[in-house]
């Protein structure tokens, strides 16, 4: 079934910034998709097109991207007559029309909005739930419910506190099902709120962009201590582990790292990659930390390779790999990490996101599907993670509707699958063994 109409508009994301929403019509009806946006972005990501008009939304409008869809992409896709089930053909047509390596002509936010809507329409055309359609596009016969990585303490560029490292996450690997994992996560989250309130006062329980708490602490080990205390207090020491997203590119200064980067610059306090690596080793020794994302700058390849060789935990590439096959291939070659963070808007189309995922999995890596800090009510990534069988997803704390929208959709999918539902649990790094 071919596309009858495409219409894009500017809407607002969870931070109050404009983003792109696309309505796509076929004979089966209307299919709507909205595009997320990151705060700490890797320099190698596909280009997110913003208007730059400071008189409007402080320069962050997306009317140019919207116009590219309505005046250029829509007519081309409609006149092509290509069916919405042909995801790769339609995505490739948009890539050809754009003609740039990083989607800078139309903007990755324009191309992705249409690509997501096409995928939803394709599922309806095949009379399949979206997650089954995605599984078919990826050539997967399995469907696996992921372990959620709840971001319960926010720092870095996601919060107004002094904390350098961006996310401290809890992973309920010992849960019996996804629904059970949600309960465990929510209980630890509420316990953590009480722990923080008792230690730092009520105003310390304000939340960051992704729903995690943002107490004004400086020491990263203090955040880990708070999370560990909440896990123990809730009674889930045996069922819960910790993950981190350091987002180290945000505090990389002149070849070194500034763990107090939100204060005025003072080069005398900067530390080397080796010193930072030793700090992570301490974290792994003293806390149940099983996953660290972006431990070093996106171009500090030597530090990545050295650290990954010396630890037995999951090392996740985000700014390093930006969901880009070329960057992933280099990271595989240099043994820089062992897990890909999959963000659809870093690469800018469903087809390329699936290709990036398959490339990582073929090389023995784990894959974690991820939201962005600027999110919408769109739940596409919930279906994506099940269809791609990656076994792990991070989409914020169990707080804020744009985060819960994804988690709630995953609970619905698990319910729909019934006895067929399998939860990744302890095998979140390698769910194919399930």
Swiss-Prot record:
Protein's name in the database: Gamma-enolase
Annotated localization: Cytoplasm; Cell membrane
InterPro entries linked to this entry: Enolase (IPR000941), Enolase-like_C_sf (IPR036849), Enolase-like_N (IPR029017), Enolase_C (IPR020810), Enolase_CS (IPR020809), Enolase_N (IPR020811)
Tissues where the protein occurs: Skeletal muscle (at protein level). The alpha/alpha homodimer is expressed in embryo and in most adult tissues. The alpha/beta heterodimer and the beta/beta homodimer are found in striated muscle, and the alpha/gamma heterodimer and the gamma/gamma homodimer in neurons.
Keywords, sorted A to Z: Acetylation, Cell membrane, Cytoplasm, Glycolysis, Hydroxylation, Isopeptide bond, Lyase, Magnesium, Membrane, Metal-binding, Phosphoprotein, Ubl conjugation
Cofactor note text: Mg(2+) is required for catalysis and for stabilizing the dimer.
Gene: Eno2
Protein's organism: Mus musculus (Mouse)
Keyword Cell inner membrane appears in the UniProt entry: no
GO cellular component: cell cortex; cell surface; cytoplasm; growth cone; membrane raft; myelin sheath; neuronal cell body; perikaryon
Positions contributing to substrate binding: 158, 167, 293, 318, 370-373, 394
Family affiliation: Belongs to the enolase family.
Biological pathway: Carbohydrate degradation; glycolysis; pyruvate from D-glyceraldehyde 3-phosphate: step 4/5
Entry binding sites for Mg(2+) 1: 40
HAMAP family, A to Z: Enolase (MF_00318)
EC number(s) reported in the record: 4.2.1.11
Signal sequence interval, chain numbering: none
Single Gene Ontology BP annotation: response to estradiol
Residue list for modification Phosphotyrosine: 44, 287
